[in-house]
Amino acid sequence: PLHWFALDQTRPLFFFAGICTPWRGTRGSARTPRAGDHQLFAFLTCAPNSVVGRIHPKAMPVILTSAAEIDTWLGADWSEARHLQRPLEDDELIEVE
C-alpha cells in the first residue's frame, strides 16, 4: 500500500535533500542496455523517525522544511550541510490519506 506524509494537515510544501549529476555510459539491464548521456539522481537518507519507522524501519529521506535549510543544502560546504542529515522530530511529520 501507498503511504503519504505531510508536515501537517495543510500539507505545506517541503523538499528532499538530493543530488543529481550527468553521466555518460551504459545503464539498464543486460537485456535492454541504454548507452548514452543520463542524469543520475539520489536522495540523502537518515534513520527514520517513529512516524516513518512504522512503515519503513531502515531509512527515510532527509526532509528540508525551511528556506534556510534549502539554502544550506544547495550552497554550503559538506562540513555544514551534513548537519541536515537527521530525521524530522516525530511531531513534525504526519501520515495522511
PLM features: what roles do these ranges have?
Residues 1-97:
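A structured binding-face within diverse protein domains that lines the active/interaction site
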